[in-house]
């Protein structure tokens, strides 16, 4: 009887050890599974600490949180130099908003996945050349970009809908965009239109270049360029537009407020939505390769007072936006 009791106690102790071992193995399995799904750290670097930049960041975060779990966000302004360096080292993905923020991140060449958003294509190409030697080297190093330059086809389509008898199209290019003149010329001719293309340098007197084209154009379209070119030409473009009663299709909300008839542009919500979609692709390992992403979405705005001055009747906005952003 005593021997039977000893055997039973020994067997019980063995069973307890096996149960404990099984528990540890199961625990290790779950611990390993949890580690494989560790938190992804996304760092936002903004060029300016303003409401519009914060709005874009918050919208991106909302879109990501609606489909993703285990994502942590941090936000810094580009001028926080020491903090930016440390935050970039700890991040899994860096998202910059604005050319100033992109320059800070690209200049550090951290070897991290980087998405530069809210930036013109010309600004990105200049930074790629400066810090990586070429666009291809920057993309190969992990940089991708969401540019705000709306395709010219969208402005052409809008102009054709607003002006059914459209023929002569005045197009203004600057130093950053003049290389695209042959491509733009072809796009206009393919649409059955007559191009009147002018190129302005920083040393030119804008009115001397713009006036001859404006007076013979049915519509005038300035292509976004450097901040200096955009600012110095806008005043003359709008004054001559008023003088010759030629509608202007601009590239920003501010252009319309200042006196352009209309604009096709990337709104903060447009930028946020497309940027969030790309980030989600990266988080889900569904991002094929780094590239320059043209605007997927667009916003259209009219200045009804300018339309009245030009004697034009503007229809419901849906008439003009139908199929516009798909180009």
Task: Name these PLM-found stretches.
Residues 36-327:
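Short hydrophobic alpha-helices and adjacent helix-cap/hinge residues
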Residues 4-20:
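Bacterial N-terminal signal peptides that target proteins for export
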Residues 19-29:
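Bacterial N-terminal signal peptides
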Residues 31-35:
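Signal peptide processing junction and immediate N-terminal pro/mature segment
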